[in-house]
Regions:
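Active-site bordering "gate/hinge" segments
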Residues: 1-253
């Protein structure tokens, strides 16, 4: 993990590097197979900026690049799976994959046949490369702090690229990338009273963020009113969409 924020101007280059790296590992996996073995591999990676706000100041900031690879090894009607975290160093990562394949191969003789084993044997390769319209992270954080001046602003910022790929020993290659941001925050009126909001998307707008923050200011005014004690009874209650969404999420666990 790096300790300072990195602008997103090189996102497309990272996309190409991630894809080439994954495809290289996929080709290497093919050389490790024996006989009728088949592999399925899924790749997941991110290249993201993060920041934590407290009292309208940036308290923590960082940049994260991480990669992982899941591998299914199939022989006849038997299959087993494992995963490795990738470092980005080709020699080290190929050694990890070699060890994983050996481990998976050692499991197969001890496993029963799986009558429900099913995977596509038809090769359908695709690519979908996202276009990064993400803002420069330091400039955006400065804009957020400026707009939140005077507020008890607490929140989390995340912005960057997400990458996923699929490959198999039959020759199929699939790749997908996207670039998003998410700012989740609360504005406190007092210790037990706060307004929560969020802003997420593909392209940042200062005007849209300011509009959402002004809504928070208006709602803070409501929280500042004299509280009323409501006696027990039956009442009709209005729930904001966000509140109703949280209740539905809880009930759908």
């Amino acid at each position: 993990m790096k300790t300072d924020l990195v602008p997103s101007s090189g996102a497309q280059g990272v996309d190409a590097e991630m894809q080439a790296y994954f495809y290289g590992l996929a080709d290497h996996l093919k050389t490790r197979l024996r006989g009728e073995e088949v592999y399925l591999a899924s790749f997941y990676a991110e290249d993201s900026d993060f920041a934590r706000f407290n009292r309208a100041l940036v308290r923590q900031a960082g940049h994260v690049t991480q990669r992982s690879l899941n591998v299914d090894l199939i022989l006849g009607e038997k299959s087993t799976a494992g995963a490795v975290t990738l470092s980005g160093d080709s020699t080290a990562d190929r050694a990890r994959l070699d060890a994983l394949v050996d481990e998976l191969r050692g499991r197969l003789p001890h496993l029963p046949d799986d009558p429900h084993l099913l995977y596509s044997r038809e090769v359908r390769s695709t690519e979908a490369h996202g276009s990064s319209k993400l803002p420069d992270a330091p400039a955006t954080l400065a804009s957020v702090l400026d707009a939140a001046r005077g507020l008890e602003f607490v929140g989390l910022w995340a912005s960057g690229g997400m990458y996923s790929g699929f490959a198999n020993s039959l020759g199929q290659r699939n790749w997908f990338s996207s670039y998003t941001f998410n700012l989740d925050w609360s504005v406190y009126h007092s210790a037990d009273k706060a307004v929560k909001s969020s802003y997420a998307g593909f392209e940042w707008s200062d005007a849209e963020f300011t509009r959402k923050l002004e809504q928070c200011r208006d709602q803070l005014g409501i929280l500042g009113r004299e509280p009323k004690t409501i006696p027990p009874g039956r009442y009709r209650v209005y729930l904001a969409p966000v509140a109703l969404g949280e209740i539905v999420d809880m009930l759908s666990w």
